[in-house]
């Protein structure tokens, strides 16, 4: 329950920050263009707070914190007095209307850049891209446990998250990747990871595991959380015990334990389960039982072991961080557009489209990891909001920009009928996209 409420809270905080910047972009440029803004609202529904400025704008915080809007004076929506007609949005030139509409996504792009600048100044704690286990394609490439990946295809890597992202992009493009690594004793080498050998189709969310790379910080002995009543573990294993090895094979993850128990069951003999209980190290002889589903079980539930301290953090000076933030924003934009292209062309699965449930979970997880992680999450979300809003779909900012582009080409605005038809098409497309996102959330 605690995680559920925390996820909702951090999602509200995230959306509120991003929506405020987005709508302020529209508001600020509208005022510069001489448009009267009637209402600036963060959230929908019943106003929880409101205040009217000297310019006549009502600033509102709504009860439903799932978006926001800027309502401008417009003759197409209500009667406008003769004295105020020059302040109506629809009376402005097409270039002014383009500037007002584009200002929202641009504000989110600038926010992304600002957040990344802050991140480079304060530093984001992370884990280095140090390999804990190398199997399958990684082992074939000559990667060994203890190797730290420093670059992939010439692009510098400072953390496991960067390495995972670059490997995923290369795998989706069906390209091999050249990994520059530093070994445990400082020796440098390069290895070609043959990602083109990955069996198609594959789950893009687990590329590193599929190629056989397990990151060192993730490999921690599992902790027993619960004992099933009547199981063979009852009376022998206790909650809090840490599983160290099974039949002499080191246990470094919950997945390890599962695979080792299955092997014990298939081999048909008891196995020695080594555990640590407090300061004691014990060896227990146990035989797994086969469930009705054909899975071998000890009768325990486990939690991942304690995560070690972060071992990677880089800070930069206030001025030095500016070009870094600009370059990182450009890189993230290119990566995001590349992913969208892959989804559209079928190179990547539509499962990569996340909805509010996934966003809430990620917001909570990043907030738990620390300020730097949450800032990075906000920068990604802000950039995504900017890009999505520029889609040429009616009802989104990009759809309005499409209307104005057509107006520039034909010399006159689209008819009300054509714009209304576009709105219906836009609603249908957006509803389909949101439905897919919710479906992916529920499956995930």
From Swiss-Prot:
Ranges annotated as spanning the membrane: 98-120, 371-393, 418-440
Cell compartment(s), UniProt: Cell inner membrane
The UniProt record lists the keyword Lipoprotein: no
Membrane disposition: Multi-pass membrane protein
Domain PDZ: 192-278
InterPro entries in UniProt: PDZ (IPR001478), PDZ_6 (IPR041489), PDZ_sf (IPR036034), Pept_M50_Zn (IPR004387), Peptidase_M50 (IPR008915)
Enzyme class: hydrolase
GO molecular function, one term: metal ion binding
Family, as annotated: Belongs to the peptidase M50B family.
Record's protein name: Putative zinc metalloprotease PD_0327
Organism annotation: Xylella fastidiosa (strain Temecula1 / ATCC 700964)
């Amino acid at each position: 329950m605690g995680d559920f409420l925390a996820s909702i809270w951090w999602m509200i905080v995230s959306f509120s920050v991003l929506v405020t910047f987005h709508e302020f972009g529209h508001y600020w440029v509208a005022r510069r263009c001489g448009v009267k803004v009637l209402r600036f609202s963060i959230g929908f529904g019943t106003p929880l707070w409101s205040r009217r400025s000297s310019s006549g704008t009502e600033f509102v915080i709504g009860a439903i914190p799932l978006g926001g809007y800027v309502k401008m004076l417009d003759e197409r929506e209500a009667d406008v007095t003769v004295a105020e007609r020059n302040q109506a949005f629809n009376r402005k030139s097409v270039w002014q209307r383009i500037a007002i509409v584009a200002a929202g996504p641009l504000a989110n792009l600038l926010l992304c850049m600002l957040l990344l600048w802050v991140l480079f100044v304060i530093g984001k704690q992370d884990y280095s891209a140090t390999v804990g286990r190398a199997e399958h394609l990684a082992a074939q490439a000559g990667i060994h446990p203890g190797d730290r990946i420093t670059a992939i295809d010439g692009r510098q890597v400072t953390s496991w998250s960067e390495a995972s992202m670059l490997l995923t992009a290369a795998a989706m493009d069906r390209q091999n990747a050249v990994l520059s690594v530093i070994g445990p004793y400082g020796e440098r080498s390069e290895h070609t990871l043959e990602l083109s050998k990955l069996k198609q189709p594959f789950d893009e969310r687990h590329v590193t595991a599929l190629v056989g790379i397990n990151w060192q910080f993730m490999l921690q002995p599992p902790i027993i959380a619960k004992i099933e009543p009547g199981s063979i573990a009852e009376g022998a294993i206790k909650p809090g015990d840490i599983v160290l090895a099974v039949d002499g094979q080191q246990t470094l993850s919950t997945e390890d334990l599962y695979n080792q128990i299955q092997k014990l069951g298939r081999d048909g003999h008891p196995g020695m389960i080594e555990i640590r209980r407090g300061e004691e190290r014990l060896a227990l002889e146990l035989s797994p039982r086969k469930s009705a589903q054909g899975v071998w079980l000890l009768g325990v539930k486990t939690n991942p072991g304690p995560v070690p301290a972060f071992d990677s953090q880089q800070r930069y000076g206030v001025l030095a961080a500016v070009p870094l933030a600009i370059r990182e924003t450009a890189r993230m934009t290119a990566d995001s557009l590349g992913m969208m292209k892959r989804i559209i062309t079928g190179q990547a699965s539509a499962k990569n489209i996340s909805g509010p449930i996934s966003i809430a979970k990620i917001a909570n997880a990043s907030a738990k990891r620390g300020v730097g992680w949450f800032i990075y999450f906000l920068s990604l979300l802000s950039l995504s909001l900017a890009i999505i809003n520029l889609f040429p779909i009616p009802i989104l900012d990009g759809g309005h920009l499409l209307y104005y582009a057509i107006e520039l080409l034909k010399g006159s605005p689209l008819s009300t009928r054509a714009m209304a038809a576009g709105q219906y098409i836009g609603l249908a497309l957006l509803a389909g996209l949101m439905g897919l996102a919710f479906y992916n959330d529920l499956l995930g």
